[in-house]
UniProtKB/Swiss-Prot annotation:
SUPFAM superfamilies, alphabetized: Bet v1-like (SSF55961)
Pfam families the record matches: Bet_v_1
Naturally occurring in which organism (per UniProt): Solanum tuberosum (Potato)
Name of the molecule in the record: Pathogenesis-related protein STH-21
Induction (record text): By wounding and fungal elicitor.
GO function terms (MF aspect): abscisic acid binding; protein phosphatase inhibitor activity; signaling receptor activity
Any single GO BP term: abscisic acid-activated signaling pathway
Length: 155
């Protein structure tokens, strides 16, 4: 098993606490409202496992995440994708560390690290990561636009 890491920093005019609440704390409710391809997000067991189910006809059927850390004080979350079509037969899991920090005039910089844990001797290709990054940025931009259009939400 190998591990390949990627880092990304994204800036936004949205305050870090608002973005954290939207993308982490209330994502189970907000994401299905903003993204029609997401049917629902359900917590399993004690809530540390979250299953995101996509609508019929979507290229992805479901994703399952294990939540390791949600730190409201430091605006940090850590979780891993542990099941789903995205992993295929080449990935064991993908771990994510996200930190939301104040930046500029009330804005935020979101710092993320993605670690791809591969199966066997598979070597991750940049295009594999780039597809995931593209989808993650799409979600980020949709939530950002919603928060900018609705300044009282999560304020």
């Amino acid at each position: 098993m190998g591990v390949t890491s990627y880092t990304l920093e994204t800036t936004t005019p949205v305050a870090p606490t608002r973005l954290f609440k939207a993308l982490v704390v209330d994502s189970d409710n907000l994401i299905p409202k903003l993204m029609p391809q997401v049917k629902n997000i359900e917590a399993e067991g004690d809530g540390s496992i979250k299953k995101m189910t996509f609508v019929e006809g979507s290229p992805i059927k479901y994703l399952k995440h294990k939540i390791h850390v949600v730190d409201d004080k430091n605006l940090v979350t850590k979780y891993s994708m542990i099941e789903g079509d995205v992993l295929g037969d080449k990935l064991e899991s993908i771990s994510y560390d996200l930190k939301f920090e104040a930046h500029g005039n009330g804005g935020c910089v979101c710092k993320s690290i993605a670690e791809y844990h591969t199966k066997g001797d598979y070597v991750l290709k940049d295009e594999d990561h780039n597809e995931g990054k593209k989808q993650g940025m799409e979600l980020f931009k949709i939530v950002e636009a919603y928060l900018l259009a609705n300044p009282s939400v999560y304020a």
